[in-house]
Structure formats: C-alpha cells, structure tokens
Amino acid sequence: MQKITKAIIPVAGWGTRRLPITKVIEKSMLPVGNRPLVDYSVQELIEAGVTDIYMVVSNTEPCQVREFYSDNIVLNDYLISRGKGDRVALTKTLPEHVKIHYIAQDANSKYGTAVPVAMAAEEYSLNEPVIVYMGDDFIWNPEGESAATSLINSLQSENDSAILGVEIPKEKVDKYGVLEVQDGKLTNVVEKPSVEEAPSNLINVSKYILSAGLLQKIVNYVNEHDFGPTDQEYMITDPIYAYIKQGQTMRVASTSGQYLDGGSVEGWVHANNVVCGVKEA
C-alpha cells in the first residue's frame, strides 16, 4: 500500500446556506454528536496514516477550528481542580505525531473548490501525492475500512490519482455529479443527469487523492485563469477533467460507508441521527 502522509481540508467560507447559526459557529464546527463535523474527517485521515493536515480557514478571528485542535490549559486546570482529571484526555483532539498547518483564505478572493487546494500546495511547496477532503461532510463506517484507506488502496502507481465513488439508489442520481467509470478508472463526471442518462449510480463526494502532477495542474489552473468580477467558480473538477483527457489515470475507489453531508439542515440532522443511533421516522 502506498503511504500518503499529507492531506488538505478546505474549511473557509461563511456557510451562508446555514445562516443564521453560522454567524457564530463555523460550518465545519457544527456538532455531530459530541464532535464537530470536520473532526470525523480528521480522525479518519489520521487513522489512514496522515501526519500533516493543511487546513484552509477563513481569515477571521477567532478561528474555532484552530481553537478546537489546540490545548486549552485553562480548561485542563479547571477539570483537574474539580476532581475531573479523567476528562482531560477528552480535550486532546490530536495525537502528538500529527500537525495541523493553517492557511488563511480571504472570503473576497477567488473562490471555488480548486482555490484552497492550490493555496495549500503553494504555501507549503507540496510536491507529493495528497488527500483532499472537504470540511462539511464525511463517510461514516465505524466497523469497516475507512474511505481514506480505500482511496490509498486503489492506487497502483505513484503517478495515479484517485476519486471516491459513493453508491446511491439510481433514482436519486439527478441531484449529483455521477461518475463514468471504465476498467476502474474515471473517464468523466456527468453533472445531475437524468436517471436514464446516468452512466452509473456512483456519485462524486469530493474526496480525492491528487498525484503530484495533478496537484501542480490545479495550481496552474488557479494562477493562470482570471474570471474577473463574475460568479464563475474555480472548480477542482475542471483541471481533473483536463488531466484525465491527457491520458492520466484517476482510479475510482468505493466505500461501504455511509455518506453524511452537514451542509444542509436536513443532512446535518440526519448525520446526528446516524452517529447517535437515533431511528428516523
């Protein structure tokens, strides 16, 4: 199995779909059970062998993500003084060998899923394969292989990239980007196709392994394009499409886990119900 030790997680933005609560709680910090959304991805990546995580955060203070992954000495002292020292371990959110690096993104700059990836790659001169996860969703699979491990296991050479495909009922494909797959490789992503025209029932949930070559292509795409004062986004899928059309390989990994999306109220409630074992009507 190829070893990948670096991951990028974009968590910047106002989370406007979740206003007004996101005025005071960052979207990626919305609670699922007793943990924030983003921590499910962080712990999964650590379990898969990642030791350096590059978080692209908003350039506002305070940064709740940074606070969550930092020691709180005042809280620890309080717990100890009240005879609750056994709870100090619950405040340790990162093992000692893992480091989170923070990159601040201006909300008024270029935007889209490619931008934070390019920012992290340039800021830290990344020139090796990296895992990319978004910060407001995760794969729930407590008894099985993690999605990150499935992605890594799908690679057959150091030049391969990979994308995670999540299987859903065919009648729901018209809400997603659907993967077109041939011999285990991605050939296209069809956005919101009709049920009849969908090439599969595997959807894109924006979880990738990017080879060093594809990572550089994403950096170039963001730097070389200027969409000006428009609403056009710098989508990570654009350089990915260009990359595979050049004959490069993006493997398609699958997971037996459940995709949980906290980006909407309904998805967030469902994620809490699943994680907490609450039966839904």
Give the residues covered by each predicted segment.
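Well-ordered alpha-helical segments embedded in enzymatic catalytic cores
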Residues: 37-40, 115-119, 239
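A structural signal for short hydrophobic beta-strand segments in well-ordered beta-sheet cores
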Residues: 29, 178-181, 252
